[in-house]
Amino acid sequence: MHKIDRKIPNIMGTQHPDNAGVPFFKGDQSKNPFITAYKEVDEAFNNFAVLDTDEYMWDWEGKHADAAVIDRLYSEHYEYFKGHQLGRDKFLTFRLPNIWEEKGYSLMQAMTTMLSAEDFARDLSFEQRPLFEAILPMAQTSEQLIEIEDKFSKLAHFKSDEFTSGSNNTDHIEMIPLFEGFKTQLHSPEILKEYLQLYEQRTGQSLPYLRVFLAGSDSALSNGFMNSIIGNKLALTRLHEFSDQKDLPIFPIAGTGSTIFRGGLSPKWIKRYLQEFPGLKTATVQSAFRYDYPLKQVQSAIKELRSGLQNNQAVSMTDREQNVLINVAKKSADCYHETLDQLINDLQKIFDAFPKRRDRRQHVGILGYSRQVDGYKMPRAITFTGSLYSVGVPPEFIGFGRALMSLNAEELAIFTRHYPNLRNDFTFLAHYISVDALESLIAKNPAWLEAKKDIQDLQSILQFEIGPSNEKEEEHSRLASDLVKISDPTTRTLLIQKQAVLRNFLG
């Protein structure tokens, strides 16, 4: 294995807008959980200094981002960053726009920010350039990664020639591909193999390591929860195999939120999370993880998570196991789509009332890309997830029950072996089923009977109780029952917000 001369971050804070409550850094007086683009610089600093995250993702994809982030961090917190240097001790990692999926207006701005940050750090006598790697979301091919590297290199040379006197900018960045769908996650080793070859042809050098990002939210939105977790597990196993074959260290990152549908990483489920993501080296602690639990609990959970990730070992699978899981994933995606297509129109009014937490660009038109499932325009994963929880039908159930019921003995044995928390997860999720709300939905659209069948199938296999188990869950269920009956959008938003606080996440 190659020697790595950098710290690999284990804990990555992100700007995912899934928090129900008010962020701790806004102070006791604030009642507003919304975080403006301007406040995100304060947020980044607090993630480093108060929560001790190793890394913070700065998102240029489909949202407004402050290009002055490095100027402000260094100017406002010079003493801190003198002792905790960006690029050496702490890491700010840009998520670039994908120019193949959306208009890349902000790509050049992000790249020039990276270059000017290097100048600023040099002027302050910092030894490491602060921004040296970037995430490419929705990565599909090795050529895309090389093209982004080429654009950065050309821009660096142009800036050095035309705008920088006396010193040159570094002309390369390290790319972190973000694989979002089941297919790209499954075939990530093949894409990376091509990328390594192209990189060597282009530079004459070999890479000392790779960081690879696996999505946990959009994959669930696109193909359902069962398909998504199988995709993550297969990718982690295959990346480990590829790492061994190439004698190349690979450090997987998972983009996971507090809901089980989006990966199930919350301060109360660290052990569960580590069991379900064997071989993972970096986890995203999103906004709900950081802001919807007491600060001391969050700090303690981050320490536990870091320790666990540093010792987290990959799990091997036989070819037979992998092939069986691929077939199970396909079955489950089919069940998910069959049901979801008939329900999506009923949810539109809930999506529209969903509370906002960040300065995002509109998800339509020329500025942002729009995710589509079976031709339907879908909201972002957080909105989708929270909306289904809010109507008393956790999205984890959709398609999962019938898919599980259809498995033969071998398929069931292999699936449950690689999903050790299956029973515990769904026993917990069943607390958020509102029987009254579901019956109201069925009365308006009989297609909701399929979701009810999923719940019943899972209950018959796993033997759990349906409905609330405490006062907070009872109130959540009552609010779900109210939500599906009212028509006023403002009241809908208020009810969704109340439910989010009760369950410790927005979506």
UniProtKB/Swiss-Prot annotation:
Gene giving rise to this polypeptide: ppcA
Organism: Oenococcus oeni (strain ATCC BAA-331 / PSU-1)
EC number(s) given by UniProt: 4.1.1.31
Assembly notes: Homotetramer.
InterPro entries associated with the record: PEP_COase_arc-type, Pyrv/PenolPyrv_kinase-like_dom
This protein's record includes keyword Lyase: yes
HAMAP family xrefs: PEPcase_type2
Reaction catalysed by this enzyme: oxaloacetate + phosphate = phosphoenolpyruvate + hydrogencarbonate
Keywords: Carbon dioxide fixation, Lyase, Magnesium
Disordered, as annotated region: 1-25
Name assigned to this protein: Phosphoenolpyruvate carboxylase
UniProt record similarity statement: Belongs to the PEPCase type 2 family.
Domain of life (superkingdom): Bacteria
GO molecular function, a single term: magnesium ion binding
Cofactor(s) named in the record: Mg(2+)
Role of this protein: Catalyzes the irreversible beta-carboxylation of phosphoenolpyruvate (PEP) to form oxaloacetate (OAA), a four-carbon dicarboxylic acid source for the tricarboxylic acid cycle.
Any GO BP annotation: tricarboxylic acid cycle
